[in-house]
C-alpha cells in the first residue's frame, strides 16, 4: 500500500515480508516476520495494520485470524491472533477466492465460511471478537457470502438466506 507491499511466499516458514517499491526497478526487502501457521489472504486494515486469514497449523485444522502491526516496516509484529477449529470443514473457499472474505475496516467486520459463517470484529485492546456464528445447511460452504445494509446482516448461498441484526 503506497510505497510498501506485504506478501507471503509459502516457502518453508511462510514469513510475512515487507518490501519498499517506491523505486519499481529496485525494490528493497525491508522486514520479515516468521509466525506459526500461514496466511492465505492479506488485507490492509488501516495505515499500520494488515489482517491475515489462513491456517494456524500445517494440518490446516485451525483457521487463524492474525493482525500484523506494520508501523515499522523493518520490524512487522503479530499483535493479535485467533484460532478457529475447522477440522470438519470440507473446504475453505477463502483459500482460493478472495471474494469469499468480507473484510471491511470501516464497518469493523471480518466474515468468512468454515463449516459455519463466522463474523468477527477487531480492536487493538481486545483483539478479535466473535459477533456471530451462523450454522449453514450445507457443509460444502462454497458460494456463501456475507452482506450487510446498515445493521442488517445476511448470509446467502446455496439457495438459502439468513438474517441477523448487528449490534449498534
Regions flagged by a language model, labelled:
Residues 1-168:
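Feature marking well-ordered beta-strand scaffolds used for ligand recognition
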Amino acid at each position: 500500500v503506497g510505497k510498501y507491499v506485504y506478501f507471503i511466499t509459502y516457502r518453508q516458514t511462510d514469513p510475512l515480508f515487507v518490501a519498499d517499491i517506491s523505486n519499481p526497478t529496485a525494490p528493497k526487502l525491508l522486514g520479515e516476520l516468521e509466525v506459526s501457521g500461514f496466511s492465505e489472504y492479506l488485507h490492509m486494515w488501516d495505515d499500520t495494520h494488515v489482517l491475515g486469514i489462513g491456517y494456524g497449523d500445517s494440518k490446516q485444522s485451525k483457521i487463524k485470524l492474525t493482525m500484523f502491526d506494520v508501523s515499522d516496516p523493518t520490524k512487522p509484529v503479530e499483535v493479535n491472533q485467533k484460532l478457529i477449529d475447522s477440522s470438519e470443514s470440507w473446504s475453505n473457499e477463502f483459500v482460493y477466492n478472495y471474494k469469499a472474505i468480507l473484510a471491511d475496516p470501516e464497518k469493523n467486520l471480518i466474515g468468512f465460511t468454515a463449516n459455519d459463517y463466522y463474523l468477527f470484529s477487531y480492536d487493538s485492546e481486545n483483539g478479535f471478537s466473535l459477533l456471530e456464528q451462523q450454522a449453514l445447511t450445507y457443509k460444502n460452504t462454497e458460494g456463501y457470502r456475507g452482506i450487510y445494509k446498515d445493521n442488517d446482516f445476511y448470509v446467502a448461498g446455496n439457495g438459502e438466506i439468513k438474517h441477523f441484526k448487528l449490534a449498534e
